[in-house]
A protein has these predicted regions:
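Hydrophobic alpha-helical connector segments
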Residues: 62, 73-106, 152, 156-163, ...
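Residues at secondary-structure transition points
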Residues: 1-16, 54, 58, 62, ...
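Hydrophobic/aromatic-rich alpha-helical bundle segments in the mid-to-C-terminal region
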Residues: 123-127, 145-210
Length: 210
């Protein structure tokens, strides 16, 4: 196998480090994780880690940004195919699959948010990342209304903030009570809150874009 060019090697190392960071952060939490533990998980020296990331916070934000981008692309694909209530249901279905695959992510995010609240610079950086998340959700929600000729009952930005806050809150509630807020109830609550209940389509695929 030919040797990787330096730029390719740097990119490969970064991917491996971020994969290791995800594992360590999810297993130990933000406070319990360290760059040394992440380096060990990835099979690298600490020097390789510090050549890519200046701090644990830098690594966390890189991981968060990648997650934001991945989820935004995923949601955009769904919104391009579905509209109305069916679009919301499909977004929820995929979000539930993601949550099942990484059940610790909402707890990690909540932990980091609590830490960032007490650190002005961390809070500023987190607020910027959070705003991009909300912007992406707002854009996708807006696209659910246009094909069915409806106007959102409240500004889509407020809807997006409500949805994002609810997702983290539901995860935390279920940590204390796994039976809290069944998915079917959450679906009905969101359909009502977003003014999409009357657009619910009984037939399979009825909400696909034509």
């Amino acid at each position: 196998m030919p040797r990787l060019r330096r730029a390719e090697q740097v990119a490969r190392n970064r991917d491996l480090l971020l994969a290791a960071a995800r594992r360590v952060f999810l297993a130990r939490g933000y406070a319990g994780a360290s760059l040394e533990a992440i380096a060990e998980d990835a099979g690298f020296s600490s020097g390789v880690v510090y050549s890519q990331f200046g701090s644990k916070a830098d690594m966390f934000f890189a991981l968060l940004e990648r997650r934001i981008e991945d989820r935004a692309s995923q949601n955009e694909r769904i919104a391009a195919e579905f509209a109305g209530a069916d679009g919301l249901r499909e977004l929820m279905r995929v979000a539930q699959e993601d949550a099942a695959a990484e059940p610790g992510w909402p707890y990690l995010l909540a932990e980091f948010r609590a830490i960032a609240m007490r650190d002005g610079e961390l809070n500023r950086r987190y607020a910027e990342a959070h705003a991009r998340t909300v912007d992406g959700i707002a854009s996708v929600l807006e696209s659910l209304y246009k094909p069915i000729g409806l106007e959102p009952p409240v500004p889509v930005r407020s809807m997006a903030e409500f949805v994002q806050a609810g997702a983290v809150g539901i995860a935390l509630e279920r940590a204390a009570n796994p039976d809290a807020l069944p998915d079917r109830d959450v679906e009905q609550l969101l359909l009502r809150a977003l003014g999409l209940l009357d657009t619910a389509v009984a037939s399979s695929g009825g909400g696909r874009r034509r």
